[in-house]
Amino acid sequence: MIDTLFSEVNINTSKEETTQISTEQFFINFINKLEGFKTKCKNLHWSAPKKNIHVYLDDFLSVISDYQDSIAEDYQGILGHMNPNVIEGVKSQSLNAIDFINEVKIATETFYNNIPSDTCYVGIKSETETFIHNIFKYKYLFEICDIRSY
């Protein structure tokens, strides 16, 4: 087990199972998910059947990138610098924009609900609230577009 000076965060992965990870790893895991979401967003953008969803996916990619950058920088201001090899995207299995945005929503809500309550994390919580707002905005925009189901 990795020793840490910081408290550990409980992540509920299911009703029966709880996994203990360090606060640092909690944030790194989510930043890795965001990295994977950026890759999936670009793949869906390139395979878009129509221009409308193509454009919205490109716009949403910028939203994800800006959010990830903000969270990563805030994390380092609180918990210290991360090593240059810790970010590795977690692969998304979504094959269309609707499934993708729902996957992003679920992961982000889970992250938000487990952010530590210490005052130093209020900026991350606030940024995540704005990101959740953007997720619902783009969910609506994706729903009114032509998408391809695989």
Residue ranges of each PLM-predicted region?
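Conserved alpha-helical segments that form or flank metal/cofactor-binding pockets of metalloenzymes
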Residues: N52-N83
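Acidic/histidine-rich alpha-helical segments that form the ligand environment
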Residues: I87-F142
